[in-house]
């Protein structure tokens, strides 16, 4: 549970812009690259974990990673302007003259050594973030926006906010795997979670590798395992093939199968909490199913989009 939000006037450092440099790039799996950033300002980057939302401020359209330029929209003013201020300035710039923004969750933060890891899933065809990561080299510059530890509010940019809940449904596609991994690692002793992963290549599963899972898990098949603290039932829903007469693909079909088995309990038992993350359209459809058809209260569902099919997801 996050610390209470301070009054607005006491929040000059809840959110900051961090100039960073690429320190290392490592391929984790067929479609994941880990980019390690360093920068003196990262000593103040808050290591809140979970599904902490950050922005990568990418190069201007047409610029190579090593030619990074930041458009004039006030992002590096001190203290960093409120997001609504600099974002409005950014939106007023012509599209070809403003830096591309993309949402991520840190894989790891190490403020003491001024480092931050971001695991980038490489989409095909490559969008701006994927193209940047594939071309990036140590020494390239970037700006990251995220939480500033000097404020002390541990809830900024975090959607995962369970209170007294200890039964969880966690649904994620590859873009949300770093956040899902953080969340699973945070589960308290005695918690139980159903973890549904939407995936194209099982080798890209960065989440269940930390669990005691033996062998592969077929589409819509499940296996039960334990973390040091919690019991996790894992379902890997492979993308690309339909899994039933309703033509639903991958994790959306898996969620409906889960709903048929557990939906009534999740609706009636206030201990249940749901977290959905990935492609914006899919998370919206799943949330609508959970609330409209299963009747789960909206205040027990957190959902966020990391990307959108067919267009940019910013803001």
Regions inferred by a protein language model and the residue ranges of each:
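Extended, composition-driven regions rather than compact fold-specific motifs
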Residues: 1-315
